[in-house]
């Protein structure tokens, strides 16, 4: 693979990762399709995907840095704006409660989960995740019990964490699972999305660090330029995608995302079967 060709592939996959990682459409499904079409598969490709995920995570850190530092008691300048109608405040405990279920299951069944990474499982996950998004829109309370991020209860955070376990099924979408779970638990669409992004930082950093540790042997010095391009591209695109997404969901429901998931599932079927 020529240098320019590999850098082009890195940029394309970085765009795909950045666009889809935090939207409820399954980045895994997209990466499988695009990687296959580009002929970029195997151990190096898996390591590359782990590295560019770090770029996407960094975008969330940049977007929510004041809120993230606030969770650990570090404040800069003016007090963090309160988001909600109650006098509550989102705390680190909410994040920990949201992490526990998936962390426990992920550690117990890590190898089993990795064995599920194949097109047929991803295709089914895309469909089921789309149905969950539709169910969340149809069954959510008419008036959210937690309109803002700071209105969330510990119970809601834990239940969102339980829904996050669905994302251990490759192709389901972590954001799709957590946002749907939040809405069904009475959290507003916007607040559920924000919580999903915040929850992504420790969850994805932990999972990515573990995967990177296990895949480090496949990384060579010659891969560094390609990995750097993918990382930077994923970071920039994810930053734009998150900002756009948070504005978009103020005006539309998740039904279009569900329909799009069904289209991607059909694409997986066409490409692989």
Curated annotation (Swiss-Prot):
List the InterPro entries hit by this protein, alphabetically. UppP
Q: Where in the cell is it found?
A: Cell inner membrane
Which keywords does this Swiss-Prot/TrEMBL entry list? Antibiotic resistance, Cell inner membrane, Cell membrane, Cell shape, Cell wall biogenesis/degradation, Hydrolase, Membrane, Peptidoglycan synthesis, Transmembrane, Transmembrane helix
* EC class: hydrolase
* Catalytic activity annotation: di-trans,octa-cis-undecaprenyl diphosphate + H2O = di-trans,octa-cis-undecaprenyl phosphate + phosphate + H(+)
Q: Explain the purpose of this protein.
A: Catalyzes the dephosphorylation of undecaprenyl diphosphate (UPP). Confers resistance to bacitracin.
Its GO biological process terms?
cell wall organization; peptidoglycan biosynthetic process; regulation of cell shape; response to antibiotic
Q: What is its main location?
A: membrane
Q: What else is known?
A: Bacitracin is thought to be involved in the inhibition of peptidoglycan synthesis by sequestering undecaprenyl diphosphate, thereby reducing the pool of lipid carrier available.
How does the protein's chain sit in the membrane according to the entry?
Answer: Multi-pass membrane protein
The EC number of this protein is 3.6.1.27
- Identification of the protein by name: Undecaprenyl-diphosphatase
Q: Name one GO cellular component term.
A: plasma membrane
Entry's family note: Belongs to the UppP family.
């Amino acid at each position: 693979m020529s240098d320019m060709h590999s850098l082009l592939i890195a940029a394309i996959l970085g765009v795909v990762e950045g666009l889809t990682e935090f939207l409820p459409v399954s980045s895994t499904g997209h990466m499988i399709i695009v990687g296959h079409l580009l002929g970029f598969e195997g151990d190096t490709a898996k390591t590359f995907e782990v590295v560019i995920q770090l770029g996407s995570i960094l975008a969330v850190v940049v977007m929510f840095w004041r809120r993230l530092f606030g969770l650990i008691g570090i404040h800069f300048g003016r007090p963090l704006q309160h988001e909600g109608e109650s006098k509550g405040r989102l705390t680190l405990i909410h994040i920990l409660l949201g992490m526990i279920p998936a962390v426990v299951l992920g550690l117990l069944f890590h190898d089993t989960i990795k064995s599920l990474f194949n097109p047929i499982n991803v295709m089914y996950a895309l469909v089921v995740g789309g149905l969950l998004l539709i169910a969340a829109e149809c069954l959510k309370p008419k008036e959210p019990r937690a309109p803002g991020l700071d209105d969330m209860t510990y119970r809601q955070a834990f239940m969102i964490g339980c829904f996050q376990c669905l994302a251990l099924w490759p192709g389901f979408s972590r954001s799709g699972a957590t946002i749907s779970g939040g809405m069904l638990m009475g959290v507003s669409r916007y607040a559920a999305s924000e919580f999903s992004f915040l929850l992504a930082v420790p969850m994805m950093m932990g999972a990515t660090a573990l995967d990177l540790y296990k895949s480090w042997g496949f990384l060579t010095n010659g891969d560094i330029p390609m990995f750097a391009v993918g990382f930077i591209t994923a970071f920039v695109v994810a930053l734009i995608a998150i900002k756009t997404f948070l504005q978009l969901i103020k005006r539309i429901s998740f039904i279009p995302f569900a329909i799009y998931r069904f289209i991607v599932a059909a694409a997986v079927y066409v490409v692989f079967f």
